[in-house]
Amino acid sequence: MTLAAYKEKVKELPLVSIFCSCFLSDPLKKQTYKYEADTVDLTWCAISDMEVIELNKRASGHSFEVILKPPSFDGIPEITATLPQKRDPSLEEIQKKLEAAEERRKYREAELRKHQAEKREHEREVILKAIEENNNFSKMAKEKLAQRMEVNKENREAHLAAMLERLQEKDKHAEEVRKNKEATR
């Protein structure tokens, strides 16, 4: 264990664990802790790599000094972390990877072409629909205009016929009045 790893290990331990959750080497001889108000029994913990010294006792509490002992590397075999050596890839593996990459590239291109074709088809459908709606609108407008012109023509002809008929009646009436006037003379 390196010194840096040891420091990290100590940082990870909670303070309560450092003071009170220590294990004796022999669990059969483990002392039982008796809780008394406002006291801490330092003999209950057996910590092999740290030393706790009581500095002074006050009415407000205790103060301690915790001295961490350096780790001893006696009897611990040296562990060297070696990564397994990477072997050189064979020509077949390289070829397989290249083929797989080519397949992925072709698949992506096909998907892109498919997406673009769908987009163009949608745009074409939208344009055709707009043209069809425009043609329908033009056709309906022409039909309405033709119908209104026909109605106007019929109304005009009927109005002219009515005016002509009234004029003829006036002429008849005037002719009768002239005849009556001449007959009375």
Swiss-Prot record:
Domain SLD as annotated: residue spans: 48-185
Basic and acidic residues: compositionally biased ranges: 166-185
Coiled-coil region list: 90-185
SUPFAM superfamilies: Stathmin
Tissue expression pattern: Nervous tissue.
GO cellular component terms listed in the entry, alphabetical order: cytoplasm; neuron projection
One GO molecular-function entry: tubulin binding
Keyword terms: Coiled coil
InterPro entries tied to this protein: Stathmin_CS, Stathmin_fam, Stathmin_sf
A GO biological process held by the record: microtubule depolymerization
Residue segments, region Disordered: 165-185
Pfam families named in the record: Stathmin
Source species, domain of life: Eukaryota
Membership in a protein family: Belongs to the stathmin family.
Protein name: Stathmin-4
Origin organism lineage: Eukaryota, Metazoa, Chordata, Craniata, Vertebrata
